[in-house]
């Protein structure tokens, strides 16, 4: 018997089973122990293959692919610390719902805990973070192929959101020519190989029932809070709220068009909070809210009912309101709960939103990161998409901009880390082949600098704006000790990104005013290549501008 040949047949069943559940993208890191999985993926024509030398970036690349494709994405890595590098992307997927299938090669059991090279305890290493965990045995013909394929099918059928970790031990030898070893074992799956359906088909009902008292609540004074959702859902939610006459507080990731812009400014005004206290019901569609003032209001509001609707399971309400947690796709829920045409009940909030917007517009000519956040709408590519980084960048765009309704916006707002942002953006672009604008801070770019390798070959224009404010300036918004702020919080690196772009043969520009930026963008959107644009801004201007605007709007 050829161990290497049967390893490959075992792996081929695993990879073929994944195709029956919509997996098309496979992300592969180099490794020897993962050879059976890698070769099975490489030889399966159903897959689009992506490779990267950095497993942490590879996991985030898969995350970006899953965000756009809305399908599970497989990741193949070798044994040892390569597996541990998938942890950040796995955690993010668990919080934001993208489906990742982590195929981690492992040493066989007899090589664990005995000093063998590159052998760690991989089974269960991700604790409670994967939605599903499957530890496969060492490949053997004593286990029928139908057990293997039905086990994979069962795990994927139970995967509603998040990651499935499949640990796959393989014994040596890992290399060798294919022969008839295991062929009969494989053929016992019959015409499954020619079919397109899973071996084991399971159905799971997820949608919430229609709320029978909706006809009563839709006649009340309500508020709509829109969190993360798809572009199509964002447009529907905006229309739904408008019909009801309810104010819509739209997050930067809501894609609703934010009809009441600058919410994180005007929510700091006591008049707005007082008017919102009249709401009898709050309907939150989508999770992962960004704005600090929005989260503060959410934590203190006490309507008669607070409903949270999202396709992801779990409470999703850090304020623990008394109300309803409804698990459903937002578009489906809206269809089951139609709006009834009513007059708007809020008077003060639209006025405050308009005044706040005017205050922001009055400062748009200054060259700085707060003004970039406000202007970002003007720089979006037609028929394209936006990827927003974390930390100060996303908060400024949320507070100061008004993104168009239905325009695709992506971000990692689950755990809200700055790791893997460039890799995720690369995955977003690869899955859509759309012109993409990504905007991150300098520390975020440094954290994922390896990902520039993923941006060397793109199918559509990709513009990466790095806002270089020389450190983690979000800490300027927090009451960090002044004497220790720079060394222990901001950690300025005093670097520029021209040499990084050159190392990966990417276009690079450092505009010094809006006219230069707009000229660079005009050229970038005409070329299917990556352009790195570094905006060097005064360190604290962005945070200070936000604080000044908050103070102004609070006194309107």
Curated annotation (Swiss-Prot):
Top-rank taxon, per record: Bacteria
Pathway: Quinol/quinone metabolism; 1,4-dihydroxy-2-naphthoate biosynthesis; 1,4-dihydroxy-2-naphthoate from chorismate: step 2/7; Quinol/quinone metabolism; menaquinone biosynthesis
Catalytic activity: isochorismate + 2-oxoglutarate + H(+) = 5-enolpyruvoyl-6-hydroxy-2-succinyl-cyclohex-3-ene-1-carboxylate + CO2
Role: Catalyzes the thiamine diphosphate-dependent decarboxylation of 2-oxoglutarate and the subsequent addition of the resulting succinic semialdehyde-thiamine pyrophosphate anion to isochorismate to yield 2-succinyl-5-enolpyruvyl-6-hydroxy-3-cyclohexene-1-carboxylate (SEPHCHC).
GO biological process: menaquinone biosynthetic process
Needed co-factor(s): Mg(2+); Mn(2+); thiamine diphosphate
Matches recorded under Pfam families: TPP_enzyme_C (PF02775), TPP_enzyme_M_2 (PF16582), TPP_enzyme_N (PF02776)
CDD domains to which the protein is assigned, alphabetical: TPP_PYR_MenD, TPP_SHCHC_synthase
UniProt protein name: 2-succinyl-5-enolpyruvyl-6-hydroxy-3-cyclohexene-1-carboxylate synthase
Cofactor binding, per record: Binds 1 thiamine pyrophosphate per subunit.
Alphabetical UniProt keywords: Magnesium, Manganese, Menaquinone biosynthesis, Metal-binding, Thiamine pyrophosphate, Transferase
Residue ranges of the TM segments: none
UniProt-listed SUPFAM superfamilies: Thiamin diphosphate-binding fold (THDP-binding)
GO MF annotations in UniProt: 2-succinyl-5-enolpyruvyl-6-hydroxy-3-cyclohexene-1-carboxylic-acid synthase activity; magnesium ion binding; manganese ion binding; thiamine pyrophosphate binding
Gene3D superfamilies: 3.40.50.970, TPP-binding domain
InterPro entries associated with the record: MenaQ_synth_MenD, MenD_middle, THDP-binding, Thiamin_PyroP_enz_TPP-bd_dom, TPP_enzyme_TPP-bd
E.C. code: 2.2.1.9
Assembly description: Homodimer.
Family note: Belongs to the TPP enzyme family. MenD subfamily.
């Amino acid at each position: 018997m050829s161990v290497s040949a049967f390893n490959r047949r075992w792996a081929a069943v695993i990879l073929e089973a994944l195709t029956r559940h919509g997996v098309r993208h496979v992300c592969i890191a180099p490794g020897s122990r993962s050879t059976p999985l890698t070769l099975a993926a490489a030889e399966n024509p159903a897959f689009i293959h992506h490779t990267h030398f950095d497993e942490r970036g590879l996991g985030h690349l898969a995350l970006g692919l899953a965000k756009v494709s809305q399908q599970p994405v497989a990741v193949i890595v070798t044994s040892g610390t390569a597996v541990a590098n998938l942890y950040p992307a796995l955690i993010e997927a668990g919080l934001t719902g993208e489906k990742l299938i982590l195929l981690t090669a492992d040493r066989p059991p007899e090589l664990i805990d005995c000093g063998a090279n590159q052998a760690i305890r991989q089974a269960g290493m991700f604790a409670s973070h994967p939605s599903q965990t499957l530890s496969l045995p060492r490949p053997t013909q004593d286990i029928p192929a139908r057990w293997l394929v039905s086990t994979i099918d069962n795990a994927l059928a139970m995967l509603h959101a998040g990651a499935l970790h499949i640990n796959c031990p393989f014994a040596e030898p890992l290399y060798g020519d294919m022969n008839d070893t295991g062929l009969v074992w494989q053929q016992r799956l019959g015409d499954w190989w020619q079919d397109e359906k899973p071996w084991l088909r399971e159905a799971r009902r997820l949608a919430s029932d229609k709320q029978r008292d909706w006809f009563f609540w839709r006649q009340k004074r309500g508020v709509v809070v829109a969190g993360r959702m798809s572009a199509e859902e964002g447009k529907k939610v905006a229309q739904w709220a408008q019909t009801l006459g309810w104010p819509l507080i739209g997050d930067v990731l809501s894609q609703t068009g934010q009809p009441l812009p600058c919410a994180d400014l005007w929510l700091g005004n006591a008049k707005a909070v007082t008017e919102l206290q009249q709401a009898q019901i709050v309907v939150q569609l989508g999770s992962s809210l960004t704005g600090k003032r929005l989260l503060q209001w959410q934590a203190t509001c006490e309507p008669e009912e607070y409903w949270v609707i999202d396709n992801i399971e779990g409470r999703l309400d850090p304020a623990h309101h008394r109300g309803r947690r409804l698990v459903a796709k937002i578009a489906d829920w809206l269809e089951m709960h139609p709006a009834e045409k009513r007059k708007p009940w809020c008077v003060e909030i639209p006025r405050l939103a308009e005044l706040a917007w005017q205050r922001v517009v009055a400062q748009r000519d200054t060259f700085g990161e707060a003004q970039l956040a406000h202007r970002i709408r003007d720089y979006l590519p037609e028929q394209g998409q936006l990827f927003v980084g974390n930390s100060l960048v996303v908060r400024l765009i949320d507070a100061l901009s008004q993104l168009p309704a239905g325009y695709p916006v992506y971000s990692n707002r689950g755990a809200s880390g700055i790791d893997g942002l460039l890799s995720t953006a690369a995955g977003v672009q690869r899955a859509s082949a759309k012109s993409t604008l990504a905007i991150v801070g300098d520390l975020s770019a440094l954290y994922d600098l390896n990902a520039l390798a993923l941006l060397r070959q793109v199918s559509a224009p990709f513009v990466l704006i790095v806002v270089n404010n020389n450190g983690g300036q979000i800490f300027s918004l927090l009451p960090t000790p002044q004497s220790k702020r720079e060394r222990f919080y901001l950690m300025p690196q005093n670097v520029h990104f021209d040499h990084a772009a050159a190392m990966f043969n990417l276009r690079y520009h450092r505009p010094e005013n809006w006219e230069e930026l707009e000229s660079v963008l005009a050229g970038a959107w005409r070329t299917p290549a990556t352009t790195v644009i570094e905006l060097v801004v005064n360190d604290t201007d962005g945070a200070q501008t936000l604080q000044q605007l908050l103070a102004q709007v609070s006194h309107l």
